[in-house]
């Protein structure tokens, strides 16, 4: 994990590294049976859709107990949690003066995987549970919030200077459902993480909150308590900044443009940087992940361009 974290910084000269992990790691290290199946994604031993199954889950704690891997071997959660801390500490040492950003999944995205039992396009079962059994949903989401916060806090304690809370599936929700059934639990994470002080900076680590397809709920996401709001490529950055007054923003180059001619990329980068000037702070990045077919040299050129234009402002 540490080497994969440091490589992009060495290769491209970006201004921060982000801890290389998986959104399912905190679930596994809380004793939940989950494996990554090739071509499918995370698959749980069983879905958590009933009050009984969720009640059984509530005794699980991050870094306690054990989980069973695909070979049937029992693995110690405490050892796994220690390996996360060690990976962060190693990455921090390797990065030197370059800060490390921690990583964690937001409660809804974790809960969606748990209720569905595997990846889903519409997260129908999770949405049904939230609407039909608020008590069970509250128990599950509170548990997910605690596990996510513990995972992120552990990374900050080990040296991460900031953290990012990813809500990959939040775009499947209506604004009302988000406000009533999801935002309170993301706020729990933000509140629990707020007290974590990075030993590297000696200060409380700022939190970035990002969700895909989040334009309809962007203003609500800004109220969760993060210091910076991530913006995906489908949302106009100038408009997004108006929705989150007083917040820094992160975003939001369309990953597809990485395949475009350089003059197209340069124009898009300049446009995003111009838009970002109206925010209290702007972290330039992609609006989603890097496509695997991307030429690494293109990424390096983008970083160089952002630095050049940023220094000139």
PLM-predicted stretches and their roles:
Residues 39-94, 98:
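A gly/proline- and charged-residue-enriched helix-loop-helix capping module
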Residues 32-36, 52-72, 115-131:
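Surface-exposed, active-site-proximal loop segments in enzymatic domains
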Residues 1-11, 84-93:
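Short alpha-helical segments and helix-capping/turn motifs at coil-helix boundaries
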Residues 16-20, 26, 99-101:
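Short, conserved beta-strand segments within well-ordered enzyme catalytic domains
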Residues 80-313:
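Active-site loop segments of alpha/beta catalytic cores
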Residues 3-20, 157-158, 223:
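Catalytic domains of carbohydrate-active enzymes, especially glycoside hydrolases
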Residues 28-32, 47, 111-116:
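Short, conserved acidic/polar surface loops in the N-terminal third of protein domains
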Residues 24-39:
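Glycine-rich loop at the start of a catalytic domain that most often binds anionic cofactors/ligands
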